[in-house]
Design a protein with these regions (language model features):
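The feature primarily captures lumenal catalytic ectodomains
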Residues: 1-362
Length: 362
């Protein structure tokens, strides 16, 4: 019965896709079909990729955007997907733009037209609420755009509905008056003008590996832009980042109670960083002398640390993300990265840390 139900659902989806293709047309990836009259592409001169090339920013008259809100975003001129400005991944791996879902399935959502100018900032699930990707993916797109265009010309950001911390950060940037179009509610949009930038650092391969090639300017700009907003409070100088608040099960200590008792006896103060305001997080990391914790989004705040801050980060050896090394190199931090063996039973955590190793590093 379940197989019949799944088969029926697939047939219904196929039928819906056919109907929407009749309405909005097929999507191709043939750049020869792009109208040079409706699209303008400019390139940054100061901000550079890791390859030392500038970033491209496009401006499309009557352009469209389609997203599945998970792994695909298509920036479209008439019926052609634009390669550098679209985004498509599968299982954490970047795909050729010819494999964007809209090339195969079309744009099976009712199109909503917006009068005015839209800057596309959405890139799928990773950019919706994750603190790290908000700082290192979404905000740099705004910076890239602002090198070539005036932000006051933008009427809308195309994103998901903002979390409180995201609203706060945009307010700190003086961008609180720009309207937000929910990419979840409006999966298919068109506007008088669509603007889109290339991704700040992800152009190929696995995202957890490519993050290690992030250009220096992103880290330096975030520090310069936001450090001044640090909110002074009675924070400990030796801090333990508690990840138990995270909805993710990876990078969690199996022997959390043992580690916690050991560190509290050493004078550490435990913080659930996600419960702090952005301004408090800035101060917490800038004020710290020693930081310990399991790998997670909170370590994005290393961008605010002072030179020579001692950082001890722990992660499973199979986890490839080493962005902390990049930040530590630029900010001249004293980073110790502990990589633990894979556990057979990860039900109550995937990291078991030998206290003796930690004690030797403190």
């Amino acid at each position: 019965m379940k197989k019949i139900s799944n088969s029926l659902n697939q047939k219904i989806k196929k039928f819906i896709q056919i109907i929407f293709k009749l309405i909005y047309g097929n999507i191709n990836h043939d750049i020869k079909k792009i109208s040079s009259e409706k699209i303008k592409i400019s390139e940054t001169k100061i901000l550079k990729k890791i390859s030392n090339e500038g970033y491209k920013v496009c401006e499309i008259s009557k352009g469209r955007i389609y997203t599945d809100f998970v792994e695909n975003v298509a920036v479209i001129e008439k019926h052609t997907i634009l390669e550098p400005f679209s985004y498509q991944t599968y299982d954490g791996k970047y795909l050729p733009y010819s494999e964007n879902t809209c090339v195969k399935k079309g744009t099976p959502r009712i199109k909503k037209y917006f009068k005015g100018n839209i800057l596309n900032l959405t890139q799928g699930a990773s950019g919706h609420s994750n603190y790290f990707h908000w700082l290192f993916d979404i905000l740099p797109k705004i910076k890239i755009f602002s090198e070539l265009h005036d932000l006051s010309s933008i009427d809308y950001f195309y994103l998901d509905n903002l979390k409180p911390y995201q609203k706060n950060i945009l307010k700190l940037m003086g961008l609180e008056n720009i309207n937000i179009i929910s990419a979840n509610k409006h999966r298919h949009i068109q506007a008088d003008k669509i603007f889109a930038t290339e991704h700040p650092w992800y152009f190929k391969g696995l995202i957890l590996e490519e993050v290690n090639n992030m250009p220096d300017w992103i880290i330096e700009w975030l520090n310069e832009k936001f450090l001044k907003f640090a909110n002074n409070f009675n924070a400990g100088e030796n801090i333990y980042i508690d990840r138990s608040e995270s909805s993710f099960k990876h990078c969690q200590f199996k022997n959390e109670n043992e580690i916690s008792r050991f560190l509290l006896n050493k004078g550490f103060v435990k913080y659930k960083v996600g419960n702090l305001s952005f301004e408090d997080q800035i101060f917490l990391f800038n004020n710290a002398k020693v930081i310990f914790g399991a790998h997670g989004a909170a370590f994005a705040n290393l961008i605010f640390c002072k030179k020579d801050t001692k950082v001890i980060e722990v992660k499973p050896e199979y986890h490839p993300n080493k962005i902390s090394k990049k930040i530590a190199k630029i900010n001249k931090l004293d980073l110790s990265l502990i990589e633990t063996k894979e556990l057979q039973n990860k039900e109550n955590g995937d990291i078991e840390l030998d206290i003796n190793i930690l004690n030797n590093l403190l």
